[in-house]
């Protein structure tokens, strides 16, 4: 929690105003932030200075793991995070590759589970990683990559957190996640949860012990219409004790995650938080 608040304060104190062409808004911006999550000791990085809807973050991650490309499928899992980008993004609404209402195109999990090969067919990146790690193999390239410039025009949004690199040391699994851009007030509380949970769940289904997850953010920013709430409300609140995160031990394979797993298979204990803050969202 401290590293999250330190980053928020750093942006407020040291950030530079940058015009964002996509949203038409200014952002207070800093470059490079490194966060670390201790998954081994269940130090769950859930924001306490406002209510964080962690279940929606887990649902979104589960949708990526399943390779979903439709906002309706994400809603069925328990999150509406893709509704706006799928249905309210003018550029995407006028894109000939859009297949209709709720279609997201070839984004995130589609790239992770079905990266198109130039000679035809697809590569299932996640399946390869899970198979390798289960066998105790780390080829120094256990990388799940969502960033495919050749297909940006075929999706509603470029990936923000675009790379997840898993590494094995003996029987301990580590994760390095890289994020090109982060809406800190709205997005970071989601992204922290997802990095943590991704390492925890991958360790569980591959039979490894979770270690640390390292989260690098390149462009960290606060939109101008979010600044007052961050500076004068959230940063004035005292952080509370961190909760603990739990996963159903019956989840034992990638196939489990693809089929029967729901949000009921994840739970948090001891989550105390301040009141919610309704930060504006920029499409």
From Swiss-Prot:
The keyword Transferase applies. It is found in: Cytoplasm. DUMP binds at residues 22, 180-183, 191, 221-223. Its main location: cytoplasm. GO terms for cellular component: cytosol. Pfam families: Thymidylat_synt. GO terms for biological process: dTMP biosynthetic process; dTTP biosynthetic process; methylation. One of its GO terms (molecular function) is thymidylate synthase activity. Keywords: Cytoplasm, Methyltransferase, Nucleotide biosynthesis, Transferase. It catalyses: dUMP + (6R)-5,10-methylene-5,6,7,8-tetrahydrofolate = 7,8-dihydrofolate + dTMP. Pathway: Pyrimidine metabolism; dTTP biosynthesis. SUPFAM superfamilies: Thymidylate synthase/dCMP hydroxymethylase (SSF55831). Gene3D superfamilies: Thymidylate synthase/dCMP hydroxymethylase domain. Its EC number is 2.1.1.45. The active site is at 160 (nucleophile). The keyword Transferase applies. (6R)-5,10-methylene-5,6,7,8-tetrahydrofolate binds at residues 183, 282. Homodimer. Catalyzes the reductive methylation of 2'-deoxyuridine-5'-monophosphate (dUMP) to 2'-deoxythymidine-5'-monophosphate (dTMP) while utilizing 5,10-methylenetetrahydrofolate (mTHF) as the methyl donor and reductant in the reaction, yielding dihydrofolate (DHF) as a by-product. This enzymatic reaction provides an intracellular de novo source of dTMP, an essential precursor for DNA biosynthesis. Belongs to the thymidylate synthase family. Bacterial-type ThyA subfamily. This is Thymidylate synthase. It comes from Vibrio parahaemolyticus serotype O3:K6 (strain RIMD 2210633).
């Amino acid at each position: 929690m401290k590293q999250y608040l330190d980053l928020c304060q750093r942006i407020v104190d040291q950030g530079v105003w940058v015009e964002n062409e996509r949203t038409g808004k200014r952002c207070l911006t800093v470059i490079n932030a490194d966060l670390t999550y201790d998954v081994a000791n269940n130090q769950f990085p859930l924001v306490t200075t406002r209510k964080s809807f962690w279940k929606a973050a887990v649902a979104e991650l589960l949708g990526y793991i399943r390779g979903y490309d439709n906002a309706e499928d994400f809603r069925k899992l328990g999150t509406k995070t893709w509704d706006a980008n799928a249905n309210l993004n003018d550029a995407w609404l006028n894109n000939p590759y859009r297949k209709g209402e709720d279609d997201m195109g070839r984004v995130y999990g589609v790239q992770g589970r079905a990266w198109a090969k130039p000679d035809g067919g697809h590569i299932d990146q996640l399946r390869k990683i899970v198979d390798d790690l289960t066998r105790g193999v780390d080829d120094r390239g256990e990388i799940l990559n969502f960033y495919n410039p050749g297909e940006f025009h075929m999706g509603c949004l470029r990936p923000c957190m675009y790379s997840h690199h898993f590494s094995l040391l003996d029987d301990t699994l580590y994760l390095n996640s890289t994020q090109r851009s982060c809406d800190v007030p709205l997005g970071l509380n989601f992204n922290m949860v997802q990095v943590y949970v991704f390492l925890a769940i991958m360790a569980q289904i591959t039979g490894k012990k979770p270690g640390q997850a390292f989260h690098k953010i390149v462009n960290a920013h606060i939109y101008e219409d979010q600044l007052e709430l961050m500076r004068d409300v959230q940063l004035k609140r005292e952080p509370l004790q961190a909760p603990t995160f739990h996963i159903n031990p019956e989840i034992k394979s990638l196939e489990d995650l693809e089929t029967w797993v729901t949000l009921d298979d994840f739970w948090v204990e001891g989550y105390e938080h301040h009141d919610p803050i309704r930060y504006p969202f920029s499409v």
